[in-house]
């Protein structure tokens, strides 16, 4: 299989997650919505490129006609990528961010983990998340008040507790030495990259 672009890696991870959780692949519109494309046509172009590279197979004319070659006979994945420092503006699962893999079943976590993020700093120590820990992350774009999220703010990735009231969001540390980050969504870009679903201490 030819090497995928970082965006295509994200699409493939989303397709796999839909297959695991729902039993069927996503539509082009669902991919576009999940990845923030302006239209399903953009998703279609990525899918065609991925098919040419051998990452997926497509059934013409079928809205969910996406198949991962060999997926019916492959065993469940037993490892997760470990993501280190994330470069500004780059997708979290871009190849250059992956340090190594950890031999653990993604299904050990609920919902399933998509990757492990190496924690930097002690801003979440009061909930048992310490510098150097591996945070198991389930990729999603929505969060509810009180959840611990991986968020991207001004191209920096951070782990904090999420709270929202209208157009105001607070990213709250679990350490009294750190002040909450207050974000006005009308003025700043905030992206939820995923939810914390567990911690591995190393």
UniProtKB/Swiss-Prot annotation:
Gene Ontology molecular functions: DNA binding; serine-type endopeptidase activity
DNA-binding region: 28-48
One of the GO biological process terms: DNA repair
Marked site (Cleavage) residue numbers: 88-89
SUPFAM superfamilies per UniProt: LexA/Signal peptidase (SSF51306), Winged helix' DNA-binding domain (SSF46785)
Top-level taxonomic group: Bacteria
Catalysed reactions, semicolon-separated: Hydrolysis of Ala-|-Gly bond in repressor LexA
Catalytic residues in the record: 123 (for autocatalytic cleavage activity), 160 (for autocatalytic cleavage activity)
Pfam families: LexA_DNA_bind, Peptidase_S24
Keywords: Autocatalytic cleavage, DNA damage, DNA repair, DNA replication, DNA-binding, Hydrolase, Repressor, SOS response, Transcription, Transcription regulation
Xref: InterPro entries: LexA, LexA-like, LexA/Signal_pep-like_sf, LexA_DNA-bd_dom, LexA_repressor, Peptidase_S24_LexA, Peptidase_S24_S26A/B/C, WH-like_DNA-bd_sf
Broadest EC class assigned to this enzyme: hydrolase
Enzyme Commission no: 3.4.21.88
Function: Represses a number of genes involved in the response to DNA damage (SOS response), including recA and lexA. In the presence of single-stranded DNA, RecA interacts with LexA causing an autocatalytic cleavage which disrupts the DNA-binding part of LexA, leading to derepression of the SOS regulon and eventually DNA repair.
Subunit structure of this chain's protein: Homodimer.
Family under the similarity heading: Belongs to the peptidase S24 family.
Name this protein carries in UniProt: LexA repressor
Protein encoded by which gene: lexA
């Amino acid at each position: 299989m030819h090497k995928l672009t970082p965006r295509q890696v994200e699409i493939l991870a989303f397709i796999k997650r839909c297959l695991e959780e729902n039993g069927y692949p996503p539509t082009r519109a669902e991919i576009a919505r999940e990845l923030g494309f302006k239209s399903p046509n953009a998703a279609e172009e990525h899918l065609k490129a991925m098919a040419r590279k051998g990452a997926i197979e497509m059934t013409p004319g079928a809205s969910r006609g996406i198949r991962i070659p060999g997926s019916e006979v492959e065993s469940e994945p037993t490892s997760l990528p470990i993501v280190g420092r994330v470069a500004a503006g780059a997708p979290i699962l871009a190849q250059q961010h992956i340090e190594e893999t950890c031999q653990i079943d993604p299904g050990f976590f609920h919902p399933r983990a998509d990757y492990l993020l190496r924690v930097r700093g002690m801003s979440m120590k009061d909930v048992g998340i310490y510098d150097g820990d591996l945070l198991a992350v389930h990729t999603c774009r929505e969060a509810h008040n009180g959840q611990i999220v991986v968020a991207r703010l001004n191209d920096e990735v951070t782990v904090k507790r999420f709270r929202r009231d209208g157009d105001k969001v607070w990213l709250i540390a679990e350490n009294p030495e750190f002040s909450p980050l207050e974000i006005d969504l009308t003025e700043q870009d905030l992206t939820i990259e995923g939810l914390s679903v567990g911690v591995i201490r190393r």
